[in-house]
């Protein structure tokens, strides 16, 4: 007779969960941040709000964003005037867009990741799909399974309405799946489309305006598995440890509510302060077991909620400016793509490390951290181990 302990041992992988491929995708419509205030106030019929436009222009100028990608074009917005009004009932129109576009954009990223992985898609055993853009049944995970032609018995996990911390959540879940299911290959997809949050400006709800200045559309996909097949699968990063915590006294700091007018966005002014106040504790918990206390000696992948968060984290930890370079580069080129952002930064870092002739995928360093920040205020922490290039 075989014991339960023996069965469990046989079911578990030997090595740590490893990122084996990364793919990203964006809608073709590229928006320049410098001219966006003009476009935004014109398309929402708000050009008479001169002072508010000046405020929005300052928000865009301070955002450290040069460009973003958006599914919503001028043509689509003209066809859907209710989406352009502030808080006009428009959920049906928004849903009709995102239930199609979210899985479609996710597929584009997934196809790239599967191609880099180099294995047949029939070897995918699990699918994690994450989006804050719309809700449907069967979900975006089901739609993606159909679009990619995955096997019907792939084990699916659908994560809706998590927000900006969820790039860390999907990694945490993928790690547990890969390490506890020998031979598992997990396709992870985060796909975010701002059609649910776009709306005209309001004098009384400036935090909504912050969202209009920051958010962009994008999808990122990973293949995650333990014990890579030699000569076939090429490791990029290993995931060594994960955690999730709710920051104390942070209720209401970041909220989103699905209403007839779409997904509304609410933000307290002191979000950067709450994040920077709690980051030290998260780092100690993560890196004390590794005897690491110099946070300039690790590589950094932080969700770029906005430049103020990055500035305060740098200041609090006395980080050198180059530590956040990959994060700031992605923010500059794409804006805040919610859950997909940190996965874009992973991709940016491994590519830049190779281009610069560095020894590892993590800017030549061995250890690194990935942070997700979002509603709650929830903080996700992932300790990464780089791979030799």
Curated annotation (Swiss-Prot):
GO terms for biological process: flavonoid biosynthetic process; polyketide biosynthetic process. Gene3D superfamilies: 3.40.47.10. PROSITE patterns: CHALCONE_SYNTH. Pathway: Secondary metabolite biosynthesis; flavonoid biosynthesis. Its EC number is 2.3.1.74. Keywords: Acyltransferase, Flavonoid biosynthesis, Transferase. One of its GO terms (molecular function) is naringenin-chalcone synthase activity. The active site is at 164. It comes from the Eukaryota. It catalyses: (E)-4-coumaroyl-CoA + 3 malonyl-CoA + 3 H(+) = 2',4,4',6'-tetrahydroxychalcone + 3 CO2 + 4 CoA. Transmembrane segments: none annotated. Belongs to the thiolase-like superfamily. Chalcone/stilbene synthases family. The primary product of this enzyme is 4,2',4',6'-tetrahydroxychalcone (also termed naringenin-chalcone or chalcone) which can under specific conditions spontaneously isomerize into naringenin. This is Chalcone synthase 1.
